[in-house]
């Protein structure tokens, strides 16, 4: 199966490896990039991989991009399997719509997609989720396998914990309810899905 991973190369100058804990998963390995842990968790023998890396052009992202390539190489993922999507340093709607278009165009027609929304400006998660919604509608057989956020808790500059959360349930909830044209039915389905999520087995 072709699996496509989406991440944003961070702007910060200093990246520290973290052990991102996940629910019902094996022990993590240290990484600077939550998407690398996602790849470790989801990649299976025989899978084909490509990674879409959103990055702004500056010295910090260039250094962090090289570090990402090094971590991917340790998983057997070569640089030619990574496709960069360049982002100008502005937040104008036309810029973000252009990035959304580029993401949709870069996604294969048949693939399972895993996206990480940890890094980047506050607009990046909106762009990424919009691109996934559009691609699911326009592509032949595209499935969203997960949408991840890596949270790091600190106190007095010390790391207390690092957690990796899959937000795909929210993405799917919006898709299911958003496609319904009868508001009463949509409201009932929305409340039923929330109720089911609150009572799901851990």
Over which residues does each language-model region extend?
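Long, low-complexity, Lys/Arg-enriched
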Residues: 1-112, 133-202
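Detector for conserved single-position "signature" residues within domains
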Residues: 115
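Short Gly/Thr/Asp-enriched flexible loops that form oxyanion-binding sites at enzyme active sites
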Residues: 122-136
């Amino acid at each position: 199966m072709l699996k496509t991973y989406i991440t944003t190369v961070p702007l910060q100058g200093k990246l520290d490896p973290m052990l991102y804990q996940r629910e019902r998963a094996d022990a993590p390995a240290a990484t600077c990039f939550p998407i690398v842990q996602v790849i470790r968790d989801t990649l299976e023998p025989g899978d084909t991989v490509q990674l879409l890396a959103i990055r702004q052009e500056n010295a910090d992202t260039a250094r962090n991009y090289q570090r990402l390539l090094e971590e991917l190489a340790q998983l057997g993922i070569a640089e030619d399997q990574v496709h960069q999507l360049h982002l100008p340093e502005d937040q104008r709607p036309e810029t973000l719509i252009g990035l959304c278009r580029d993401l949709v165009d870069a996604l294969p027609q048949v693939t399972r997609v895993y996206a990480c929304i940890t890094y980047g400006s506050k607009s990046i998660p909106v762009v990424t989720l919009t691109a996934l919604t559009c691609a699911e509608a326009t592509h032949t057989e595209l499935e969203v396998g997960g949408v991840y956020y890596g949270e790091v808790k600190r106190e007095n500059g010390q790391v207390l914990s690092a957690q990796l959360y899959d937000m795909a349930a929210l993405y799917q909830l919006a898709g299911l309810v958003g496609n319904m044209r009868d508001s009463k039915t949509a409201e009932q389905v929305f409340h039923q899905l929330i109720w089911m999520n609150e009572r799901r087995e851990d």
